[in-house]
A protein has these predicted regions:
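Glycine- and acidic
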Residues: 122-123, 181-188, 228-234, 269-280, ...
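C-terminal, non-catalytic "cap/extension" segments appended to globular domains
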Residues: 114-117, 227, 354, 362, ...
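Active-site-adjacent "gating/activation" loops or surface patches in catalytic cores
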Residues: 160-172, 280-355, 359-364, 466
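Hydrophobic alpha-helical scaffolding
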Residues: 127, 131, 185, 189-193, ...
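Post-HExxH zinc-binding segment in Zn-dependent metallohydrolases
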Residues: 242-243, 367, 378-407, 413-415, ...
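A well-structured
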Residues: 1-278, 290
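Catalytic Zn2+-binding segment of zinc metalloproteases
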Residues: 359-373, 393
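A glycine-rich phosphate-binding loop feature that marks nucleotide/adenosyl-phosphate handling sites
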Residues: 255-274, 308-319, 379, 412-414, ...
Length: 557
């Protein structure tokens, strides 16, 4: 079914509560594991319906944040979402404590039961008012960012539409664009500080209500980190500082030389070529058609997937003034349908949507064939391997998008992927500092960010910019506001995707087989087990990062 034809009606959560209560009673009355699993199938049907309708409403609001009807629906789900989470929790608690646990664990898998345990540790009914407040604060941030009106080049632009000017080949244009963006954030600095301060206090209060010292423990549970913790993440970040930061700085210096500059400035970030970054040559329609050709040639599985997405119009990718910033893939379980949301703006980022977000969507499409819904509850550190690796697997088709600048794109993509890892680790370490010290003032948080920038991105020079030069860059990173602690996942995944890059250059067919296997494993096993099973090294293992850097050196000679 096409997305626009999918019917929508507001979910009546009082009715859902009754239905969930009935399922819990049926679990109690069941006389065997088999009977409980039959009840569990009804739970799948109920949660599929709720999640599908909530997701439709949220997508339609994101597509047009000025739509009053879906704004009201979005607010309704922000209020009712935590109530629903609590109903799910009550059901899962009953399942978790089942006398037929051995049968159910064999049927659903040990990962699902570990995740249920983490869910019990991350939520309680007492948190509902705080979670509702948290939702309204993140919505306030989203609306503030989506509502940016920046006069530039004779047009009124939002932040997504300003992006091409930030990487323009003309340094003067870049400087003006960065100054305009800085002015927007400076003008809204007080509101941004207030929203974040309230979020930190709110999340800390949630953690303390659950008996934790600070939000980190609660945040790790909420991110479903079921086979690693803070110590492993810190060890990984240390490896990045020791081996990857020097490698990334080498790449930045190579970029500086290519740009013919004596010194890099912040206005040169993510600019890779003197004559500008490669941009797609076609219209949005031509980019989508090229994507279809590419996925038809890549494999039978990707061909079937992309044709399904196109036939059912499961993309909304054109940038518009009142559209939410950013891009994502989400899933509509009733229709076994992934959905991709993005903001095309004429840069190479448009093609990244067709590779990165389609990597997520392809895995979601494959996972839909698994009747055990819990197998789709993927940790983000695994989910991002699917998307980031697809960016590399599709490289040989880049001529369809970039013409004679395809090789420039491939070089830029590798450098950008490598340069991202220190930034991602910095975002993670910043959040660890913030949540370990919730008493920090907005100014102290910015000082912490500036210190981390010197450690992770020593080449960076803000030239005294009044906003970015004062440690404010993180305020444009929506994950920090909306999805706390969701960022190191990208770094862990990128280290795996870079391993796939090395593997596919040695033997593409074998690398693709390994990737397909990982996609199909979904969340049926723990992250650390799955990456081992498909022949990848764990980023947590000592020496993993050093080994990757040594193999990547050959690409930058």
């Amino acid at each position: 079914m096409r997305f626009q034809d999918m019917p929508y009606e507001r979910i009546d959560f009082a009715k859902v509560q009754e239905e969930m209560g009935e399922l819990i009673r049926e679990l109690d009355a069941a006389k065997s594991g088999e009977e409980q699993f039959e009840v569990h199938k009804k739970y799948y049907a109920l949660t599929d319906r709720v999640m599908t309708l909530m997701t439709i409403a949220n997508i339609r609001f994101d597509i047009d944040t000025s739509d009053k009807f879906y704004e009201e629906e979005h607010k309704y789900y922000d209020e009712q979402g935590p109530v629903f989470s609590n109903l799910v929790l009550a059901y899962q608690k009953k399942l978790y404590e089942s006398p037929y646990r051995a049968y159910l664990e064999e049927k659903i898998g040990p990962v699902a039961f570990k995740n249920m345990e983490l869910a019990q540790k991350s939520m309680s009914e007492a948190l509902i008012p705080l979670m509702q407040e948290e939702n309204s604060l993140t919505m306030e941030y989203d609306k503030l960012i989506a509502g940016a009106k920046i006069d530039f080049d004779g047009r009124e632009l939002n932040l997504s539409l300003l992006r091409p000017y930030l990487v323009n080949s003309d340094r003067n244009v870049r400087r003006q664009a960065w100054e305009k963006m800085s002015a927007f954030f400076l003008e809204n600095e007080e509101q941004l500080d207030t929203i974040y301060d309230k979020l930190v206090k709110n999340r800390t209060a949630q953690a303390r209500a659950m008996g934790y010292e600070n939000y980190l423990e609660l945040g790790y549970y909420r991110m479903n980190r079921n086979c690693y913790g803070k110590d492993e993440v810190e060890a990984f970040r240390r490896q990045i500082k020791e081996y990857f930061v020097p490698f990334a700085e080498k790449l930045h210096d190579r970029r500086r030389q290519r740009l013919g500059l004596e010194k890099l400035s912040y206005i040169d970030e993510q600019v890779y070529f003197k004559d500008g970054n490669p941009a797609p040559t076609g219209t949005p329609e031509e980019i989508m058609a090229a994507g279809q050709k590419m996925y038809r040639e890549l494999s039978p599985e990707t061909a079937e997937f992309f044709d399904f997405m196109m036939e059912n119009q499961l993309f909304d990718v054109l940038g518009r003034k009142t559209k939410k910033a950013g891009g994502y893939m989400t899933y509509l379980p009733l229709y076994h349908a992934p959905f991709i949301f993005a903001n095309f703006n004429g840069t190479s980022g448009d093609v990244d949507v067709i590779t990165h977000e389609c990597g997520h969507a392809f895995q979601g499409y494959l996972a839909a064939q698994d009747p055990i819904r819990e197998h789709a509850d993927i940790g983000m550190e695994t989910a991002e391997i699917h998307s980031m690796s697809m960016e590399f697997f599709t490289e040989k088709w880049m001529n369809l998008f970039f013409g004679d600048r395809a090789q420039d794109y491939v070089e830029m993509h590798l450098e950008d992927a490598a340069a991202f890892i220190p930034y991602g680790c910095m975002v993670d370490e910043f959040q660890h500092i913030v949540y370990e010290h919730p008493e920090l003032t907005p100014a102290e948080r910015k000082q912490a960010w500036s210190r981390l920038e010197r450690e992770y991105k020593p080449h960076l020079d803000y030239e005294g910019d009044p906003f970015f030069g004062q440690g404010g860059f993180w305020q444009k990173q929506l994950h920090i506001y909306d999805y706390p602690l969701y960022y190191i996942d990208y770094c862990l995944a990128q280290t795996c995707a870079l391993q796939y890059k090395v593997k596919m250059d040695a033997d593409f067919t074998e690398a693709w087989k390994s990737y397909l296997k990982l996609c199909r494993l979904s969340a049926s096993d723990f992250y650390t087990n799955m990456i081992k099973e498909v022949g990848l090294d764990s980023p947590f293992e000592p020496g993993c990062v050093k080994n990757i850097v040594e193999k990547l050196e050959k690409y930058v000679k």
